[in-house]
Amino acid sequence: TLTVLKEMKTQGMIENEDEYNAAVKEVEDGLKFEKGYSGTSSYSYHTAETVKQVIKQVMEEKNISEDLAKNYVYGSGLTIYSTEDQKVQARVEEEFAKTKYQIKGREKNKNGELKNDHTQAGMVIIDNQTNQVVAVGGSLGEQKTTGWNRGTQLTRQTGSSMKPLADIVPGLQERVITAATIYDDAITDFGGGYKPKDYNNPKGYINIRSCIRTSQNIPMVKVMMELTPKKSIEYLKKMGITTLDDTKDANPALSIGGLSKGISPLEMAGAYASIANDGVYTAPIFFTKVVDSSGNTVLTANQEKTRVISEQNAYLTRSIVSEPTKSGGTATYCAIPGMETCAKTGSTDDYVDRWLCGFTPYYTAACWFGYDNDQEPLKVGKTTYSVDGRNPAGQLWSSIMKDIHKGLANKNFNKPSTGLVQKTICKDTGGVATSSCTNTYTETFTTDNVPENCQGHGTQKICTESGKVANEYCPADKVKTVSYGGVIPKEQLKLWNTINKSKSSSEKIDEVCTIHTKKIEEKTSNENKTPTNTVEKEQNKIGNTLEKPTTKPEENKVPDETGKDETAKDETAD
């Protein structure tokens, strides 16, 4: 190290003798490490990454090689002020050490050796107020902090956890979609033989909010086709994603996490934090400053900020990404009582990779789970390997996040005071409801991105007992007016070919009610007459027995936008 100092002095990096002598003394003192919250000097995956970040910044600011930077950092008696929260870090390490997450490897290489000893995981937690990284999980089992840090170094395909970042964020900001926009979730040919599938059954006509709740793939690809992968990549880069290939990743699969290189938990956490922080991306940091032995600050962490989307669209994105934690969603077990919780699951083919990314007003966290060798899946045949019956990444996320929120005041995100408006929306088309729309709900929009009025609706009177067109004999209290038809604007685009288009729940009904007939009405009239003799009474008894319907046909159900009539999805799925 002393030799390095001499070289630095020769190159003019140390300008005078006093500075040189002070540096020599610091070398003899050695490197000191201070936690920003506790002052402890224990070594963790967070600590290891902190030192790497300091070395990287020294290289950039002093324009020196990595070797020179390492020697300067390790041998100059520096004190590094870390952002680690010791309590949060300890909770991560405690959960990562549990054996239930260590699913043994099964596949062997040509030498008969296991490709993987057991599953692994990586996790990063960010404090939303400061955008400081407070904890890192780098491996399952024994904490080998000098090894590969899966929280910061691993890059893997993200699956559906990419949807809020690649589709919703840019889609809202570019006014391609709203929360109410409807697509036909049916098998679709996007060209070049690309026909993605859903992990669960296609839902037919479905809006964006519901798509995220149950993690439908096909509508998200349709969003990407109109938005374009190029535009999506622009936004992803603004959110701190550095591993994208402008050529290889510029395809529709980007919409559902199909990537050439993948993304690290650190960068996923940083990107999600931009949604939590009202649409502003702030680079996550591991240290705040570095001082020398004399107390002089020699390095301050770089923390650049970038406005990605408007405050209003960030609010809407949070609202949409909270759907998976609600009834019928894929991450209901991640909901934190008293906290507004947003969470999105992610899975790749055969569950090779499992993800859970999400946030509360306090923290943002991203967790990956899988095997180091990405050729070994977590789904074999009909068997899906899980932890406690859940997505293992989601179980890690849920257990840790719920614990670190204990004792914190209940909190929701702030709603912008301006720039938002509520409208009554037609559930069948996603347009602003008109007098012809009978199936409606209320949705929130930015003032510059409100849907057009619903078009193409007609109305007809339906018998609620038969579910068919009411005839002249249907009782008035059994007749209701419903809308039919309606234009789905996005499905008029010529950007894809929807195969076997879904049948709309609002299609016109042609069959006429056969339950209520003239004969029954005459019978009813007879019932209202006062019998004049015993024979007439007995005739009425017989008539009632023979003519009264024995069962009441089930009333037609109109799918509820909130998804309450949908079967809750198996939580082991995406």
Could you describe each region identified by the protein language model?
Residues 82-110, 123-127, 135-138, 142-157, ...:
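A penicillin-recognizing enzyme superfamily signal
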Residues 194-197, 228-270:
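Mid-domain, small-residue-enriched loop/turn segments at the edges of structured enzyme/sensor domains
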Residues 119-120, 144-165, 174, 179-182, ...:
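Short active-site loop at a secondary-structure junction
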Residues 4-5, 9, 33-39, 75-83, ...:
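Second-shell loop/turn segments in exported
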Residues 3-10, 22, 45-49, 53, ...:
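Extracytoplasmic/secreted proteins, especially bacterial periplasmic and envelope-associated proteins
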